């Protein structure tokens, strides 16, 4: 059902945690995968090597998505290397868990530049290729705080809420070319970068989920693969919650 043979995918933040799971799932479905990273070079190269060892096609691409010119250069390189682009997964993000009164303008700009402008940059650079594909897919990954809010995540939630609006608008604007745009809103996914905080608060955190566990990258990747495939061709402008029942909006 999720046959992606002959398609090219770009996954931002594709070398670690949820992004790594998405990169692997798209490759398993047959896509050639451009694995973007900002500073996590070793992790990205490991994911690429795993895909290649399994017989897939993948290549790492360094770019700070907050830098429009860097994104344009990355997308141009993907086109040169793979011949085009069919699938864009906006997965990279930046979250600073702080009380709003303790945040600084620098904190605001860092999170908005990555979470909102980063998605805008990638979509703008990729849009001509996605529309030319005739089956373009844009899938943006975010926390469910973007829909329901969360204490300590005000700025990141606001930035990601803007990305939801971006996806809905692009779904309307680009749909005539066969391009879809959707958001996936996540509950807390266990990952290496916040392992200490999760371990310290696990018992409290897990009680917020009707399904008494936190999420895994493997809970997310299959939905991305479905949306990227022909099976997702009539799903657009939607916000799909993968949150273990944390929110039921």
Feature map (PLM): residue ranges:
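Catalytic loop of short-chain dehydrogenase/reductase
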Residues: 97, 139-162, 167-176, 188
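Substrate-binding pocket helix/loop in short-chain dehydrogenase/reductase
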Residues: 99-100, 104-112, 194, 205
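Short C-terminal tail/terminal secondary-structure segment
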Residues: 3, 148, 204-208, 225, ...
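Conserved glycine-rich cofactor-binding loop
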Residues: 8, 15-17
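Short, small/polar-rich loop/turn modules that mediate ligand/substrate recognition or access, typified
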Residues: 135, 175, 180, 235-237
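Alpha-helical segment proximal to the catalytic Tyr-Lys
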Residues: 128, 172-173, 233
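A glycine/serine/threonine-rich, flexible loop-to-helix segment
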Residues: 172, 176, 183-209
